[in-house]
Amino acid sequence: MSTAVANRLVEIDEEARLAAVRRYDILDTPPDGSFDHVAKVAASLFDVPIAIISLVDHDRIWFKARYGLDVEQIGRDPGLCASAILQTDPYVLTDASCDPRSLANPLVAGEFGLRFYVAAPLRTGDGHNLGTLCVIDHKPRVVSEEQIAQLEALAAVVMDQMELRLAARRAVTELEQMVALKDAALERSSMLTREIDHRVMNSLQQVSALLSLQARGLGNSDAA
């Protein structure tokens, strides 16, 4: 496969992934206690100062929930989450300053001083990674397989919450559409009733007029 074809396939997949992000309609929504709680639990599980639930947009990484961090978003480059969503398995950096994948990253080499980073992808049922649940520390750490499995379980909880919210929004939309259809049907029924009443009234008036004419005709005949 040529490089151009491979790059185009990546672009198509990214377009589909971004469409999935939009489908959940969660970017730039207010803080949510259930997501905040998951981030706090993740930080406690790893005994680290920072945990983030992130969504990777086309040019930024937006934080739906964050523990131990004040910023709401960062640029997609150099964010590590943008790299983490490229794989289905958790992305693990026990010492980012020594890992060739990250040692030149500004978040590692710069003032922030990131050293430890573990991210579990937020993966949809149709196979798109929307973002990550990640934990961060400023010093190297050892991580166990059990901790990684627990982080994946928490990421699944995040996706369950997102799916529930999506289903609720769809249910509300369907209900609103049904109400609109019902109102439209009632309006049509009301208009039809008014039209029938109008036609019946006109017919009655015509019959009454004919009867009056007939009565006058009979009266004139009697007089003759």
Question: Language-model segments: which ranges?
Answer:
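Regulatory sensory and allosteric helical modules in signal-transduction proteins
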Residues: 19-20, 50, 56-66, 71-115
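Signal-transducing coiled-coil linker helix
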Residues: 167, 171-174, 178-199
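Short beta-strand-to-loop transition segments that serve as allosteric relay/switch motifs
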Residues: 132-141
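A short, aliphatic-rich beta-strand micro-motif
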Residues: 115-124
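Signal-transmission linkers at sensory-effector interfaces
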Residues: 1-32
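Amphipathic alpha-helical "output/dimerization" segments
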Residues: 143-160
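Helix-loop-beta substructure at the N-terminus of cytosolic sensory domains
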Residues: 1, 28-61, 77, 213-224
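Histidine phosphotransfer helical core of two-component systems
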Residues: 188-191, 204-224
